[in-house]
């Protein structure tokens, strides 16, 4: 199906209905030729005449094997698609007074995210006067990064943005969700990891 779409994009041989073309190709003297002469040159080489730039004046045509040309175009499309792979960012939220159980629970999830190739955006959320403990939040995030050094590296050191102190980690090994540096802005998937709360009598809920 994709090959059919490619075929529709390019005119070849007798389908090229113009008076003259600019000819390029291997073992070809680049220049402007009447269409009849360009077709003859392609035929003598056992190749096809492929119009690669129809909007140029005159249109640019390449002398090449058409099937080889389609293969090259398909390969180029795959490479471009690979460069545009979305970067997945998973979010992990901490409180400034995070206990060891909560910390280890989220650390385990972060390891899994980095192993699958996702970036991890960890942050400490400061509620009300808890902003006074921002230094404690920074220490927590640096500890988090240190415990994950075998899985990811720090892309952004802890920085305070409003009520959140954020650190960004990127996987050490490329996974299915990672992308080359040339990729566009990452897509943030907000999967905030919180610690499961055990049920208590009266269904009381405890806050983090």
From Swiss-Prot:
Oligomer and partners: Monomer.
Gene: infC
Name of the protein in question: Translation initiation factor IF-3
Pfam families: IF3_C, IF3_N
Chief subcellular location: cytoplasm
GO MF term list: ribosome binding; translation initiation factor activity
Alphabetized InterPro entries for the sequence: T_IF-3_C_sf, T_IF-3_N_sf, Translation_initiation_fac_3, Translation_initiation_fac_3_C, Translation_initiation_fac_3_N
Keywords attached to this entry: Cytoplasm, Initiation factor, Protein biosynthesis
Species, as recorded: Parabacteroides distasonis (strain ATCC 8503 / DSM 20701 / CIP 104284 / JCM 5825 / NCTC 11152)
Stated family: Belongs to the IF-3 family.
Keyword Protein biosynthesis: yes
């Amino acid at each position: 199906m994709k090959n059919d779409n490619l075929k529709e994009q390019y005119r070849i041989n007798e389908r090229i209905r113009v008076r003259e073309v600019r000819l390029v190709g291997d073992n070809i003297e680049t220049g402007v030729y009447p269409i009849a002469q360009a077709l003859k040159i392609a035929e003598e080489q056992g190749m096809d005449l492929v119009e690669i730039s129809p909007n140029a004046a005159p249109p640019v045509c390449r002398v090449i094997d058409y099937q080889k040309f389609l293969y090259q175009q398909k390969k180029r499309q795959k490479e471009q698609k690979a460069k545009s792979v979305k970067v997945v960012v998973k979010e992990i939220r901490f409180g400034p007074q995070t206990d060891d159980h909560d910390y280890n629970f989220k650390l385990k999830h972060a390891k899994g995210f980095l192993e699958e190739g996702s970036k991890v955006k960890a942050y400490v959320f400061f509620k009300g006067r808890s902003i006074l403990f921002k230094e404690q939040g920074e220490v927590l995030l640096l500890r988090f990064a240190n415990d994950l050094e075998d899985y990811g590296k720090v892309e952004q050191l802890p920085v305070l943005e409003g009520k959140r102190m954020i650190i960004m980690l990127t996987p050490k090994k490329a996974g299915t969700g990672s992308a080359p540096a040339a990729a566009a802005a990452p897509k943030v998937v907000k999967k905030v990891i919180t610690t499961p709360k055990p049920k208590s009598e009266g269904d009381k809920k405890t806050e983090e």
